[in-house]
Amino acid sequence: MTHYSDSKKSTQGPISKISSAMATTISPATKTYPLDLTNIPYATTSDLNNLSIHLPQAPVPEDPNRLFLIYIHGGAWRDPAILAPSFAATQSHLLNLTSNNPSTQDAISGIATINYRLSPYPAHPTNPSNPHDPSRNARHPDHINDVLAAILYLQETYAFGNRYVLIGHSCGATLALQVAMKRFWGSQYDPTSALELNVEPPIAVIGVSGIYDMPRLVDDNAAQPAYRDLVVNAMGSERKVWEDASPSSGDFEDGWEDGRLVVLVHSEADELVGLEQSEIMWKVFGEQGFGEEAGSQRRRKCIKLTDLKHDEIWEDGKKFAEVIAQTVDEIVRGEEKN
């Protein structure tokens, strides 16, 4: 982690809902699958409000037997070098894995990777942020509102409802669980509140190397000011905002009614985010009715890796892909039993 300058609070307005003219229309009769769609805008707010989609098969609206996978990248809310394409290696391994497992392969209706506005990073060595660039001057709740807008776009386009798995790495895991928290991130009467009202939370979340308790992250690394700088840069200086934005403060028992499975993945070799972040979240879910036993109606699962550093999990992608495939398979098998 590196030091960077604090920034003024974002003056960016609410998410602008993308017009119907910009929406992507998929006609199974005129498309060849698998199909890849890249840099699709889901809002007009900035150049980073886009997503990419891999469709292994023709989409079937409201298909009760398939799952959409949605990935949210990490990068400390600010790194322009870690965007949606960072999922490429994992996605490639995942497609290879599932090609040998027809039931899991058939269960995946699509894979989407989301970009969202970043917080300032004027000290970035090769791509410093410009204070006039709306894509590089975000402040909470801009990030989560972008993610909600992207999910809403996907739900309206492909009509999969809550049948999706939200996957996030590092601060992407923070954002994934913020979606499940089902909170109003802006003022109650702010137009962006419609996003929280209209987005259906996922049935499962996979959090990898996640930041789940921001005050604890800052306190545990008090000797390294870069951690505080990172949180202030993305969230502002008010500790109460950090607490409220932390998934560790979420009411998942009542707020995430459709949540059936949460998978917390962390490597003991992670040099940036300590294992205690996942341990905190594990305890939170346990206290809120998520069991450990296979077959539990609401389940929590912990996967500890031993040999991969923070970014190596997605750079290599093999073990990451295995976790995703196992999660999809577990959901499918659980539904078959019921």
Model-assigned labels for residue ranges:
Residues L48-N50, H54-D106:
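Short, surface-exposed "cap/lid" segments of acyl-processing enzymes
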Residues P134-Y158:
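Alpha/beta-hydrolase active-site loop
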Residues V265, L272-N338:
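C-terminal catalytic histidine-bearing segment of alpha/beta-hydrolase fold enzymes
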